């Protein structure tokens, strides 16, 4: 099971990282964008027992980026 999660996680990262980074950069600028995207992927890794890689994963990723960006901007 763990090997399967790692393979799926790597594929997810390769598929979505560039687009998420572009989106985050548009929201918060280059300085904070990479940190936000990495935070989202770290959170997925930490919650691997409860994460489901279904049809809604793309929406989940982009919504997570948006939420983290808004929270960051609120606290600046």
Name what the model sees in each region.
Residues 52, 66-76:
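Arg/Lys-rich amphipathic alpha helix in sigma70-family domain 2
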Residues 22, 35-42, 55-67:
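Structural recognition of an alpha-helix C-terminal capping motif at a helix-to-coil junction
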Residues 12-16, 20, 65:
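Hydrophobic/aromatic residues within well-ordered alpha-helical segments
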């Amino acid at each position: 099971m763990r090997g399967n999660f790692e393979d799926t996680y790597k594929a997810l990262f390769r598929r979505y990282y560039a687009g998420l980074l572009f989106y985050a950069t548009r929201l918060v600028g280059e300085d904070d964008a990479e940190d936000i995207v990495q935070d989202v992927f770290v959170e997925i890794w930490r919650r691997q027992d409860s994460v489901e890689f279904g049809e809604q994963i793309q929406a989940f990723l982009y919504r997570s980026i948006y939420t983290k960006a808004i929270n960051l901007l609120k606290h600046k």
